[in-house]
């Protein structure tokens, strides 16, 4: 792709998650021109992650026959906790080796002062949906981002809710189980993320397998496959009882969280995106997952907000964060 043949300006978007990093080039209409996914490699520290990110940026620039001179600005999104005005991560549960890291200034300096903007990953994804995705006609939106953890972006009257201390929308850490709740990576017990985050889902699944629960997952793991949300999804598609139980429990908990936000915010739409949506709208399992969320919300929510709030999958899928 030659930049002379396309209308600029162009932007680099970087969506850093606890497992993967997504990097893309986007034009000012939100069209993705190139995309690359790489590993965060959290256990190896921030330098390893940055090396992968810089290489991914080089790759997408090459795909478009661009140089950094063709790029107007860089956008970076990470999971919380964070200091958005200060441009740094604070103490993110799913990026523990990035604690206190000044990501915005580091990337800006690496690219010779290129304008660099920093935002919470769920907020960025919510704005992507609001800008060019499934919430284009909405004035208020909640977007759940389901991945290694559970993020949440909130837009009310066209404004992203960042909060006074950059912690607005950390709804994955709402407490949904007061007694004997599961431990979350945040150090709290009974959070929504402890039940519906991908990392927690895998951990609880392993505990049940170790306790002797029957499942196809035993043979799948013994065959050399790594236990992951994807593997649990594959087992569920074969009607594995344990896998379906775990996914439906995750959906039930998300239904509880969705009800809470419905009563708190009363938004036009509540959408679900990210890598742990079990195939999303294109999958029968994904549709069962969504229907369980809706049913839990129907049972718990006031009638008027439930009947007038759209609950669906995000249109942009896992691309929303870097867009």
Predicted regions: what they are:
Residues 136-196:
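Glycine-rich phosphate-binding loop of actin/hexokinase-like ATP-binding domains
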Residues 118-120, 126:
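Short loop/edge segments at beta-strand edges and connector loops
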Residues 36-38, 93, 164:
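Short hydrophobic alpha-helix segments
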Residues 27, 72, 78, 120, ...:
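A cytosolic small-molecule/anion-sensing beta-strand core signal
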Residues 31-32, 89, 160-161:
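Hydrophobic "anchor" residues
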Residues 15, 75-79, 143-149, 153-155, ...:
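Short beta-strand segments
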Residues 87-99:
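A charged helix-plus-loop insertion that forms the helical arch/lid used to bind
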Residues 1-73, 84-86, 107-115, 131-138, ...:
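ATP-binding/phosphotransfer module of carbohydrate and carboxylate kinases, centering on a glycine-rich
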């Amino acid at each position: 792709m030659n930049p002379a043949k396309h209308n600029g300006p162009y932007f680099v978007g970087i969506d850093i998650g606890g497992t993967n990093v997504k990097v893309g080039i986007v034009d000012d209409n939100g069209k993705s021109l190139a995309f690359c996914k790489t590993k965060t490699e959290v256990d190896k520290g921030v330098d390893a992650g940055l090396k992968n990110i810089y290489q991914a940026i080089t790759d997408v620039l090459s795909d478009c026959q661009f140089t950094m001179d063709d790029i107007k600005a860089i956008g970076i999104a990470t999971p919380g906790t964070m200091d958005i005005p200060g441009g740094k991560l604070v103490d993110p549960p799913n990026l523990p080796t990035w604690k206190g890291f000044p990501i915005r200034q580091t990337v800006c300096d690496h690219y010779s002062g290129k304008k660099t903007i920093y935002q919470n990953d769920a907020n960025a994804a919510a704005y992507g949906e609001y800008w060019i995705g499934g919430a284009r006609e909405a004035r208020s939106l909640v977007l759940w981002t389901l991945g290694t953890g559970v993020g949440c972006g909130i837009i009310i009257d066209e404004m992203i809710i960042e909060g006074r201390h950059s912690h607005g929308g950390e709804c994955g850490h709402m407490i949904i189980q007061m007694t004997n709740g599961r431990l979350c990576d945040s150090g709290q017990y009974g959070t929504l993320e402890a039940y519906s985050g991908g990392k927690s889902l895998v951990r609880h699944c392993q505990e049940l397998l170790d306790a002797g629960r029957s499942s196809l997952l035993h043979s799948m793991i013994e065959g050399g496959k790594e236990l992951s949300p994807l593997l649990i999804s594959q087992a569920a598609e074969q009607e594995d009882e344990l896998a379906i139980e775990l996914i439906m429990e995750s959906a039930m908990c998300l239904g509880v969280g969705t009800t809470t936000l419905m009563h708190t915010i009363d938004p036009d739409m509540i959408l679900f995106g990210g890598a742990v949506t079990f195939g999303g709208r294109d999958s029968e399992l994904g549709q069962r997952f969504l229907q369980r969320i809706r049913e839990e919300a129907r049972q718990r929510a006031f009638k008027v907000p439930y009947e007038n709030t759209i609950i669906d999958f995000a249109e942009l899928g896992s691309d929303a964060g870097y867009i």
